[in-house]
Swiss-Prot record:
Pfam families cross-referenced by the UniProt entry: HMG_box (PF00505)
An example Gene Ontology CC term for this record: nucleus
Keywords per UniProt: Activator, Calmodulin-binding, Cytoplasm, Differentiation, DNA-binding, Nucleus, Repressor, Sexual differentiation, Transcription, Transcription regulation
Keyword check for Cell membrane: no
Name listed for the protein in its UniProt record: Sex-determining region Y protein
Bias kind Polar residues: ranges: 176-189
Length: 232
């Protein structure tokens, strides 16, 4: 029984030594690997391509709001950062010039030190990440092909022309549709159809009025009576 316990203790001790040895080996590899060190130092700043980004010196408002932001966040833990910034901006505007002056002096001192330390410094704002375009928003190839295949042809959309004026108007519309973009084809075709319908209706009304004015009134002939027999 004691031999079993001693063997179990020996196995546990061996496993513990192996774990400690692995931990030391991993830590040595992490410290001696330059890639790992570079990744730790430049984590979150991969856009600079390994160059240490120089921060701008803080202005008077940033110096004042540094402590005030922490105070407001502790007093209002549910408040978002954007709301805290709005509140701090309002409080900064309410301060007098005498209250702001110490922060302006400190900001000027920091700018002078920054200018001496980085004489060739130029402010380069970071580029905003462009949102990726969704493929669902782009027009599909089938819809583009369908728009290109839309034609204004008499075989597809036959029209009945009443006069030469309607024919010329439709010819001009065909030229305009052929030179315009495919998106406007449907609306132009609908306008042309409405124009032709109104023209045809107006022509038919004028023709009917002309016929009623030119033709004499027609009365049905009465049955022959004595007056018709003696007075033809």
């Amino acid at each position: 029984m004691f031999g079993v316990l001693n063997s179990d203790d020996h196995c546990a001790a061996v496993q513990q030594r192996n774990i400690l040895a692995f931990g030391r080996t991993f830590s040595e590899f992490w410290m001696n690997n330059p890639t790992s060190n570079y990744r730790c130092e430049t984590e979150g700043n991969s856009r600079d391509s390994g160059q240490n980004r120089v921060r701008r010196p803080m202005n008077a408002f940033m110096l004042w709001s540094r402590d005030q932001r922490r105070k407001v966040a502790l007093e209002n833990p549910q408040m978002q950062n954007s709301e805290i910034s709005k509140q701090l901006g309002y409080q900064w505007e309410m301060l007098t010039e005498a209250e702001k002056w110490p922060f302006f002096e400190e900001a000027q001192r920091l700018q002078a030190m920054h200018r001496q330390k980085y004489p060739d410094y130029k402010y380069r704002p970071r580029r905003k990440a462009t949102p990726q375009k969704d493929d669902k928003l782009l027009p599909s190839a089938s819809s583009s092909t369908l728009c290109r295949q839309v034609r204004v042809d008499e075989t597809w959309y036959p029209f009945t022309y009443r006069n030469s004026h309607t024919r010329a108007a439709h010819s001009g519309m065909e030229d305009q549709l052929s030179s315009s973009q495919p998106v406007n084809v449907a609306s132009s075709l609908l306008q042309q159809e409405q124009h032709c319908s109104s023209t045809s209706f107006r022509d038919s009304r004028e023709t009917l009025a002309t016929q009623l004015w030119a033709d004499p009134p027609f009365y049905p002939k009465q049955q022959l009576g004595l007056s018709d027999a003696y007075f033809p």
